Amino acid sequence: MKIFSTKRNKIMVLVILLVIVFFFGLKSYFKTDEQNAEAVEQTNPLALNWLSYNEGLALAEKENKYVLIDFYTDWCGYCKKMDKETYSKDEVKKILNENFVVVKVNAESENKVIENGEEITERELARLYQVSGYPTTWFLESNHSRVAPLPGYVTTEQFIPVLNYIGEGWYKSITFKEYSEKI
C-alpha cells in the first residue's frame, strides 16, 4: 500500500473522506427536513385559528357560527393538558372548524377587549363570565348570547358530544341528557 506511505497522502485521503461524509450528511439533513414538512402537512391538515375575543366575536357574527371561548391561565396545568390532549385531536378540530370560531382569553391578562361598548381587561372579562376555575370553556351563539359554560379539563371523548350538541343546535330543543341518550 504505497498510496498511504507518505504523511501527505494520508492527510489528503482523510480530507477527501471528510468532504464526502460532510456532503452526504448535508444532503440527508435537508432531505429529512423536506420529508418532515410534507409529513406534517399530510398527517395534520386541520389547524385551529385561535382568535382574540373581539376578532372572534366579529368573525362568528359574520360567518354565523358559534363561539367557543377558552378561558385559561399561563400557570394552569390542566389548560395545557387540554390544549395538548383535547384541542389537538383531528376530530375535535374538524367539528370546531365547521361550527365554531375559537377564541382564547388569558384570564389573568391586562390585555384590553371591548365588551358591551366598554374597554375592559381580559381579567375583568373572565369575571363577567363568572370564571372561577381553569380551564373554563364558554359557548356563545353567533349574536354573542351565552349558551353555557363548561368548567374544567375535558377529555376528547367527553368534549365531542358537547361540541356536537351545541354546534348542531340541539341545545335549543332538548336537554343534554336527552341528546346523550339519543346518540
Segments predicted by a language model, with ranges:
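Flexible coil segments in periplasmic/lumen-exposed cytochrome c-class electron-transfer proteins
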Residues: 170-183
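Non-catalytic, surface beta->alpha helical segment in thiol-disulfide oxidoreductase systems
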Residues: 85-87, 124-173
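Typically the conserved alpha-helix immediately C-terminal to a functionally engaged Cys/Sec
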Residues: 78-97
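A short beta-strand-turn-helix
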Residues: 49-66, 96
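N-terminal targeting signals for export/organelle localization
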Residues: 1-46
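Solvent-exposed coil/turn segments that connect beta secondary-structure elements
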Residues: 74, 107-110, 142-143, 155
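Structural alpha/beta surface segment adjacent to cysteine/selenocysteine redox centers
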Residues: 105-132
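Short active-site neighborhood of thiol/selenol oxidoreductases, capturing the structured segment around
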Residues: 62-77, 102
